[in-house]
């Protein structure tokens, strides 16, 4: 997959993507990441990329022409069709389901805004989709782009050492539940012991425990994700069991 990022700070994206899963994806040739600075396409001695908004008001607005020229160069560098995605608090919320859709694309172009945003005419003519990583405002779209690059990169075949890691993540699967708790060594610690079932070697019992914990954790922490009416009978039974086992003082 190829991801082109249009940003006034392309080095920021490159640094974020140099480590961990995204860095591994690039090393393995599974992800190509390229940054583009619209300032290089601006005119004049100062290479200005922003100006005051019509109608007055605070802040500056990113200009059409540097962005248009930059995008033209990006599209000429690789002729494969690619949606232009603007990182914006007004966009469609980024979910795991949307990430899976985007991960199937051969290429996409990410646009990072700054200041008060981007001239609306550029957005109307050049942008296919706006995506938000949350209901808050950042100084620019670079952090949002870094998040999107990471979530899409880890879904590429061959990036994770164990493909099951992605399949068992929170929000994965047809029902999009939260993940169950995980434990490692030591089995006994001053802060608690690993549940006996996870050390039993009984794979059926372990799978049942993990499913119950996943259902229960979703019910406790993200009830908006849990459509109880759509749960299978066995899942409803497990959730009821989880509720019965939950001590009153554990309910937060």
Curated annotation (Swiss-Prot):
Query: EC annotation?
Result: 2.1.1.228
- Reaction catalyzed: guanosine(37) in tRNA + S-adenosyl-L-methionine = N(1)-methylguanosine(37) in tRNA + S-adenosyl-L-homocysteine + H(+)
Keywords in alphabetical order, please: Cytoplasm, Methyltransferase, S-adenosyl-L-methionine, Transferase, tRNA processing
Task: State the superkingdom.
Answer: Bacteria
The record's annotation in CDD domains points to:
TrmD-like
Q: Which GO terms describe its biological process?
A: tRNA N1-guanine methylation
Localization per Swiss-Prot or TrEMBL: Cytoplasm
Q: Does the keyword Nucleotidyltransferase apply?
A: no
Q: List the disulfide bonds.
A: none
- Oligomer status and interactors: Homodimer.
The free-text function statement in the UniProt record for this protein reads: Specifically methylates guanosine-37 in various tRNAs.
Family under the similarity heading: Belongs to the RNA methyltransferase TrmD family.
- Tell me what this protein is called: tRNA (guanine-N(1)-)-methyltransferase
Q: Which organism is it from?
A: Xanthomonas euvesicatoria pv. vesicatoria (strain 85-10) (Xanthomonas campestris pv. vesicatoria)
Q: Which gene encodes it?
A: trmD
């Amino acid at each position: 997959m190829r991801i082109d990022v249009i940003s006034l700070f392309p080095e920021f994206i490159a640094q974020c993507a140099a480590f961990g899963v995204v860095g591994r994806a690039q090393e393995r040739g599974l992800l190509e990441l390229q940054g583009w600075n619209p300032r290089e396409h601006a005119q004049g001695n100062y290479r200005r990329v922003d100006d005051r908004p019509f109608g007055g008001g605070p802040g500056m607005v990113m200009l059409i022409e540097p962005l248009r020229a930059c995008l033209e160069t990006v599209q000429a560098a690789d002729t494969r069709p690619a949606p232009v995605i603007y990182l914006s608090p007004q966009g469609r919320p980024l979910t795991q389901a949307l990430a899976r859709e985007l991960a199937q694309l051969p290429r996409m172009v990410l646009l990072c805004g700054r200041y008060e945003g981007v001239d609306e005419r550029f957005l109307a003519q050049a942008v296919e989709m706006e995506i938000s990583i949350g209901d808050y405002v950042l100084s620019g779209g670079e952090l949002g782009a870094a998040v999107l690059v990471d979530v899409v990169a880890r879904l590429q075949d061959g990036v994770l050492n164990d493909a099951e890691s992605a399949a068992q993540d929170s929000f994965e699967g047809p029902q999009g539940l939260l993940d169950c708790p995980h434990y490692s060594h030591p089995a006994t610690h001053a802060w608690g012991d690993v549940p006996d079932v996870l050390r039993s070697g009984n794979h059926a019992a372990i799978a049942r425990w993990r499913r119950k914990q996943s259902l229960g954790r979703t019910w406790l922490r993200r009830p908006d994700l849990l459509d109880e009416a759509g749960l299978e009978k066995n899942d409803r039974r497990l959730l009821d069991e989880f509720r019965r086992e939950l001590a009153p003082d554990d309910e937060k």
